[in-house]
Amino acid sequence: MEKEKRNQFLATGFFLFGIAFLYVPSILMVPTVIAQNAVLLKGIALVFLSIAAILVGTSFKDKQRIAVISGIGLAVGLSFLYLPVPSILSGSAFHILFACAIAFGMTTAAKQAAAIGSALLACIGIVFLYQPFFPALGGTALHLLLPGIIVFSIVFSQKTLCERISIGLIALGLIALCQPFLMLFYQTGFQLLLAGLTGFIVAAHR
């Protein structure tokens, strides 16, 4: 019981610090030193929010409430990504989607629906990655691909298949980065590699 309360306290702390590091550097009144290190602070924020999501998924008993909140968080992240919102919000979309995907995957009871939805989200991310008509959509592909892979790797019943898909993405990413012929394939190799590594790590430790 004490360990559970401690983890809940840590989850709250990591969440608050993550939010602070995510949004404080974008406020105009902050000192110059903080504003100059905004990228570093946002990187730390992603780590803190991810840790908070993992602790929330393991230490709180009301899994259904966490799943609903994190599902709303996913919707909010998508709205920040595609709706005309201030830059301080659009710049935080990836962090929100990444952290909420972890919490949602760990707590949702609708495993089958979540697996289908996350697979669809990842597929849309891949389509956005390679479509040549709207460059702005290509810039948001990783925002869809990683959360989709994370949720799918957690909720899908066949762990071995998740690992194989992830290994396939890793192989495709490496091939893309090593081949000199197709520039679009080369430019997207890192995203495929990152998605594959993320999916494999999540599937191996779920």
Language-model segment annotations:
Residues F9-T12, G43-L46, S92, A115, ...:
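Alpha-helical transmembrane segments of integral membrane proteins
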Residues M1-K3:
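Short, Lys/Arg-rich, polar N-terminal cytosolic tail immediately upstream
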Residues F48-K63, C100-A110, P147-F156:
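Canonical alpha-helical transmembrane segments
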Residues F15, L49, G138-V155, T160-L177, ...:
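Polytopic alpha-helical membrane-helix bundles and their juxtamembrane interface segments
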Residues T12, L28-V30, A52, T58, ...:
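Long, leucine/valine-rich, helix-dominated scaffolding and oligomerization segments
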Residues F17, L22-V24, M29, V47-L49, ...:
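Hydrophobic alpha-helical segments of integral membrane proteins
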Residues I27-G43, F60-I66, F80-H95, A109-A114, ...:
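Membrane-helix interface and helix-disruption motif detector
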Residues Q8-L22, A67-G77, A115-G125, S166-L172:
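Alpha-helical transmembrane segments
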